[in-house]
């Protein structure tokens, strides 16, 4: 799978069977050209689909390369557009983008250009890709990534002690998501403060006062409805151990409120190896109770970055 950097982090989950794909392990002396020639595919496709620009003749030994063979292609004619080509061939525009990474999610094509409509080898199971992105993400990175997205979380909305929402300037990146029609936007609600750290003082204050929960839910839902968010992603980190049992109750309340509007709720949790794992990141989290309270759980694995 071609790697992308959203300026934050990507979550990828799915099931692929290798027998439906060609995975080539580079041997000493092999190049992109020799490998592509062996399999009868375009070297340009091999480079683009594996992010190998600049490495064509100096591939590291042992590198695994995905070989994709087009089963149907299309040659661009004068006055063709990407949307017209997709419609003519019975695929979505995003499928055209995904099959042709060289487009970078853009519509710039030229007569004589060969585009891939279908590949021989494809995953037999569905997949989903979700990601968090800062609002200052480079437009080019956003455009080339969005056609692959099924979940998208602009990072991040906050709140204060009165349960008022700290706004996020997400209009531009949301407009790009809706332009591609590629996925669902989830409202990311966290306890991240202006100094870049998660505040367990703020989370404890909120969790201790249930009267604030309805205010927070009202404010969150109002913005979700105004901006077209499909769900809520709650991300309270470094919770105090004393909040371990009240947090799932709060999650259950928020889930009920957003479910009433036809939306889903995700909770992001740190990876734990045991229920009693010590550490500030883990002691306030109860997998079982949170799992029962939320629609979905996102188990994160980036604690090595924030510890």
Spell out what each predicted region is.
Residues 17-39, 63-90, 113:
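Primarily a LysM-type cell-wall glycan-binding module
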Residues 56-57, 63-78, 83-84, 104, ...:
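Intrinsically disordered, low-complexity Ser/Thr-rich linker and spacer segments
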Residues 132, 153-155, 186-190, 233-237, ...:
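A cross-family glycoside hydrolase active-site/sugar-binding cleft signature
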Residues 76, 80, 167-168, 207-215, ...:
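Soluble non-cytosolic domains of exported or imported proteins
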Residues 1-20:
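N-terminal amphipathic/basic-hydrophobic helices that include classical n-h-c signal peptides
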Residues 161-168, 245-249, 253-307:
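Substrate-binding surface in catalytic domains of secreted glycosidases
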Residues 120-216:
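Glycan-recognition patch characteristic of GH18 chitinases/ENGases
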Residues 217-246, 296-307:
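Active-site groove signature of glycoside hydrolases
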């Amino acid at each position: 799978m071609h790697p992308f950097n959203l300026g934050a982090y990507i979550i990828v989950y799915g099931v692929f069977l290798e027998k439906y794909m060609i995975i080539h392990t580079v041997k000493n002396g092999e190049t992109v050209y020799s490998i592509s020639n062996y399999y009868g595919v375009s070297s340009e496709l091999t480079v683009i689909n594996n992010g190998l620009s600049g490495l064509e003749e100096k591939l590291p030994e042992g590198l695994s390369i995905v070989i994709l063979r087009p089963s149907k292609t299309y040659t661009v004619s004068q006055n063709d557009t990407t949307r017209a080509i997709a419609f003519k061939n019975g695929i979505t525009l995003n499928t055209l983008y995904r099959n042709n990474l060289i487009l970078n999610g853009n519509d710039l094509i030229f007569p004589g250009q060969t585009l891939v409509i279908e590949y021989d080898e494809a995953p037999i199971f569905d997949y989903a890709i979700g990601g968090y992105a800062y609002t200052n993400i480079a437009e080019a990175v956003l455009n080339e990534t969005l056609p692959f997205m099924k979940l998208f979380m602009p990072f991040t909305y906050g709140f204060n002690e009165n349960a008022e929402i700290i706004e996020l300037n997400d209009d531009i990146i949301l407009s790009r998501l809706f332009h591609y029609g590629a996925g669902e936007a989830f409202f990311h609600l966290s306890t991240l403060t202006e100094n870049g750290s998660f505040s367990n003082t703020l989370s404890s204050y909120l969790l201790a006062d249930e009267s604030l929960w309805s205010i927070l839910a009202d404010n969150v839902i109002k913005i979700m409805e105004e901006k077209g968010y499909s769900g809520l992603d709650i991300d309270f980190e470094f919770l105090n151990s004393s909040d371990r049992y009240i947090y799932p109750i709060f999650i259950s309340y928020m889930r009920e409120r957003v479910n009433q509007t036809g939306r889903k709720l995700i909770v992001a949790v740190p990876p734990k190896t045991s229920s009693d794992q010590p550490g500030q990141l883990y002691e306030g989290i109860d997998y079982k109770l949170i799992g029962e309270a939320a629609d979905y759980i996102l188990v994160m694995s980036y604690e090595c970055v924030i510890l």
